[in-house]
Amino acid sequence: MRFRHKAAALAATLALPLAGLVGLASPAQAATSATATFQKTSDWGTGFGGKWTVKNTGTTSLSSWTVEWDFPSGTKVTSAWDATVTNSADHWTAKNVGWNGTLAPGASVSFGFNGSGPGSPSGCKINGGSCDGSSVPGDEAPSAPGTPTASNITDTSVKLSWSAATDDKGVKNYDVLRDGATVATVTGTTYTDNGLTKGTDYSYSVKARDTGDQTGPASGSVKVTTTGGDGGEPNPNPGAEVKMGYFTNWGVYGRNYHVKNLVTSGSAEKITHINLRFGNVQGGKCTIGDAYADYDKAYTADQSVDGVADTWDQPLRANFNQLRNLKAEYPHIKILYSFGGWTWSGGFPDAVKNPAAFAKSCHDLVEDPRWADVFDGIDLDWEYPNACGLSCDETSAPNAFSSMMKAMRAEFGQDYLITAAVTADGSDGGKIDAADYGEASKYIDWYNVMTYDFFGAWAKNGPTAPHSPLNAYDGIPQQGFTTADAMAKFKSKGVPADKLLIGIGFYGRGWTGVTQSAPGGTATGPAAGTYEAGIEDYKVLKNSCPATGTVAGTAYAHCGTNWWSYDTPATIKSKMDWAEQQGLGGAFFWEFSGDTTNGELVSAIDSGLK
């Protein structure tokens, strides 16, 4: 399970040239004719993904290759691809399959595997020689140092000590590895690692290097947990700290909005959480929503967060991999996988007939070994339990929602973020009254209260009304359809204020055929929009139809015969002030691509909650 305060297991590609591999090759393919390097591609706590890359560094072709290495006790390969992998106890051997054994000079090939346990490979050999191609005849590699001991552990540092390695010619220095990556090279047998994150798990091991520059096997590993953190209880105290944005997987198509845009806009440094939307709910299970956008689409170097192009054979690509890269650069960001939504909520009623089985299916998908390190939580967006959305839920009892959330908490445990997007219908007998949100709040970290889309051009003749009113105003078409009413209703049902997030739409809703500037006018239908009639991104509206007035804490605009309502940086600031006064848990928004290229709405949320 991927926990909230686990360190990002892979901040970058971990190139670990390790000493050694057994070979079935001829003398022409000995020590210096090939190299093998290991990369840990993912880590989900109880296991990891790994990749070996074999390269022909000689001047003649290789006809076959064999890689060997040792794992410490308790670490093993559970599945592999593009190589035949066998073992004798803790010694592992990988041989080429038929199609990838021949390597021309300078060519390389990779194979991958999933593993369990905390250890790293050591004693690597490629075709009988050192994996780094630097075997020295008559000079033995150093032994493994002693397993490090940890002391003086603080929120941000730890002191490591180990017993010396031995070598026939002498030990020159030691590489200190944190989570498999070298973080320091020292000549002594102690090292203090600084700049760590509080309340976070790390794993350390050490390798010795001799005077011939040969690297020996890694020591055993020691687990270290820095002090601090939240103690593992759901929603310990988010206060006004949660600043969450929805990233839509379909945005990579027509909208041409990618994870890298969060970096170039400056938004990544100003948010705390991302909800990736959407996974589907089908046949009583959580399922992938768009496999191509989620984990298959290849990114070029200029499109990628880390500036590295995807390869055809890497285990994970597309949005999942880009989000992994984003977390490596911005480790404060937590990512949740969101399931359901307006279009895909129809599967929830069947799923909650067996909440435990549904929760297990969601856990198995979110914690799939290929991307378990990407996600820190799950978000359930059921529109709506025991009520109508795109379709009507006519089979679930009022307690179905809390039963689902209870099962999710039991399956995922206390250290995993569990949230839900919920209705903001605060009217008497409305959607909030239809489900047991108060009881369910015992099991969730927070609710994303969808305080937008109260009014829109689905009522094609009007009256025109702001789609995200903070409070009521004279002439509002429906009582209880405001942010204030929704929050008051949830609180009355026992939901703690700090488990409620206010929602901001990064878009406007509008009508055409409108002659009246103030709200309440008649219309002839929805105004034209870039992707859908009646809706338009803020980044477009701020220039095409600038705000001409405010009502109920939000803005509206009358331009020509069109009438739009949307939030601006100024109205967002007032809503953030209100959220803090109410003791809410923060804010979220739908969704990133509606903002300007410099992220001015995200900036307004960020500054408003400080």
From Swiss-Prot:
Residues 213-224 have a biased composition (Polar residues). Chitin binds at D313, Q314, G340, G341, W342, T343, Y384, M450, T451, Y452, D453, W590. Belongs to the glycosyl hydrolase 18 family. Chitinase class II subfamily. The keyword Signal applies. Gene3D superfamilies: 2.60.40.290, 3.10.50.10, Glycosidases, Immunoglobulins. It is an enzyme of class 3 (hydrolase). Induction: By chitin. Residues 241-610 form the GH18 domain. GO terms for biological process: chitin catabolic process; polysaccharide catabolic process. It comes from Streptomyces plicatus. This is Chitinase 63. Keywords: Carbohydrate metabolism, Chitin degradation, Chitin-binding, Glycosidase, Hydrolase, Polysaccharide degradation, Signal. Residues 1-30 form the signal peptide. The active site is at E383. Residues 125-153, 208-239 are annotated as: Disordered. Residues 144-229 form the Fibronectin type-III domain. Transmembrane segments: none annotated. The gene is chtA.
